[in-house]
Amino acid sequence: MTIKSMTEYETISYKTFLDIFSPLPEIGEILEESESVEEAREKLFEFCKELEWEIRMGRIKFDNEVDRWLALKAIEVFLNIISKDNERLAGFSTLEYLWKAYKGDEEALKEIREGFIEEFRHLFLAMSGKADYSLGFLGKRLLEEGVKFIDFSKIKGREAGIARSNFLDKVYEIMREYISRYPSGLDKRIILKRKKNREILEEFFGITDEEWFNYKWQFKNVLRGLKGVKILRELREVTNFKISDEDLEIIEKAVKNGIPFGLTPYYLHLFDFENPYVEDLAVRRQVIPPEWYVEKMIEHKEDRNIAFDFMGEHDTSPIDLVTRRYVTIAIIKPYESCPQICVYCQRNWMVQDFDAKAFPGWEKVEKALDWFAEHDSMIEILITGGDPFSLSDKAIEKMLNRIAEMNHVVGVRFGTRTIVTAPMRITDELAELLGSFEKSLMISTHVESCYEITPEVAEAVKKLRTNNIYIYNQHVFHRYVSRRFENVALRIALKKVGIIPYYTFYPKGKMEHKDYLVPIARLAQEVKEEARLLPGSFRTDEPIFNVPRMGKNHLRAWQDRELIAIKPNGSRVYLMHPWEKGIYPTKLYTYEDVPIKEYLDSLKEIGENIEEYKTIWYYY
């Protein structure tokens, strides 16, 4: 998915701009008659409060109370956007663009993009009660298929129960249709396809099944550097493996410029060799970087550790290898690489090539562990990296033995993706070692799509669960795994193998990850319109936005964020409320989101019907 550059956009016509005011022409009239932005602000405030009062007094009628609720919420959003104080926080005035553009100011019209137009078109529809949000994204289709909505005021008892059950069956039929778009690695068709892929790779590398299923062979033969590029080229030449010239060139450019690239042979066999970039799109985009990412990493080659440290770990590390953002838990990073390097990694600024140099040495690790021993506030330790399961069993045991001596530590959590990228790393010996630890121990992983869930993953999870170790999933909700019901398909696959949905992360808003970002509204939409259709035990994941230096911020409601501005390109500007609010003094964080229009365009490019996402505009 390629995002347009600013120069590729066409200037919005004045007529197109004026059309957005048709649901509420009074707003346009106020802008036209106002001699200044401040005059417009005051008159718009008065208009909005009068409109709100008319709604609250019941003088404006709505077909559905949901549309009434949305109108009031949209008015609140508009008042937020025209607020003088919010302009100070955002660093610019959305109202000024509206006012100037309505006056026909050519410079303002040149800056305004379709995303801006669409935001206000939908906002004014919502304020006027004409958004038709109450029909829902499935309502139109259900009506077209002759499905009747249940009115419990008209039918009662068993008749109502049967009617409701039949209605919900129809909803599930549509839900199942969506889910079927995303094959799981547990599907027989996919299992057979990957068996053939494995056989092809075994023949190519000249190895047996025994070697393939040995994690040490997998680690030793990670495709990295120019040698890895050469292997991919040779595979394309002598087997049925397909990869585009563009991707090969981008990978080569990355490694030549010192950008770490790593791909385990196991994860490579998850690719669709013969029909690439369709069912395996998410898998490929996990490891194959887009051009924008590579260019940005090269641009900041000398200051990468500062430019891309989105979470401000330099400011939250009391000692080498330790990061602390919370009261009772901190991170230790004993290995600074992974057998497979994910493009969207938040620690791309510190991740090294997968080799011995990524281990910082026992002296540093022991000093970091001493820090935990000295701080009795640390009741849990998160061992992450990089990937700590890149280390030997002996190294892992050595760290656990040291932690076992710390009476104040209640539990340990390992953060690893080897369960997905090299599941053979979870040997009986490692599982038993972890299970023998006398304190509470759990594992968090990153499964990104149901296509990654395989029989090998299921076997790895089984070994851990047999030793009373629970595995939790932290899903990064990036652009390539954000289609309708894609995360629902993932949750179902996770539950099948015994992994518990834990967090769904908004991807870190890092400039180099532009091609992976989604609007916050899409995550909110997914939770409300898709995840909600699953049983509660399947949707145990919390939607999360990470605030730099402060950490996880829930995306539940307006107590967590405020929409305070819309930029000319259609980007929403949010004021994020950190978890510390209400506990002690803290500062709020201003974040510029990816434009919804830009995101929808990217979905359209891969064949999605963006009409299916039309309610996204109403998640503020």
UniProtKB/Swiss-Prot annotation:
Domain (Radical SAM core): give its ranges.
Answer: 324-586
SS bonds (residue pairs): none
Give one GO term, molecular function aspect: catalytic activity
Record's PROSITE patterns? RADICAL_SAM
Q: Which residues carry this modification: N6-(pyridoxal phosphate)lysine?
A: 552
Q: Which domain of life is it from?
A: Archaea
| Residue positions binding [4Fe-4S] cluster | 338, 342, 345
Explain how, and how many, cofactor molecules are bound: Binds 1 [4Fe-4S] cluster. The cluster is coordinated with 3 cysteines and an exchangeable S-adenosyl-L-methionine.
User: In its keyword annotation, does this UniProt entry include Transport?
Assistant: no
What does the UniProt keyword field contain? 4Fe-4S, Iron, Iron-sulfur, Metal-binding, Pyridoxal phosphate, S-adenosyl-L-methionine
Q: Which InterPro entries match?
A: Aldolase_TIM, Lys_aminomutase/Glu_NH3_mut, rSAM
This protein's record includes keyword Heme:
no
Needed cofactors, names only, are:
[4Fe-4S] cluster; pyridoxal 5'-phosphate
Similarity comment: Belongs to the radical SAM superfamily. KamA family.
| PANTHER family registered for this protein in UniProt | L-LYSINE 2,3-AMINOMUTASE AQ_1632-RELATED, LYSINE 2,3-AMINOMUTASE-RELATED
Q: What is this protein called?
A: Uncharacterized KamA family protein MJ0634
**Species:** Methanocaldococcus jannaschii (strain ATCC 43067 / DSM 2661 / JAL-1 / JCM 10045 / NBRC 100440) (Methanococcus jannaschii)
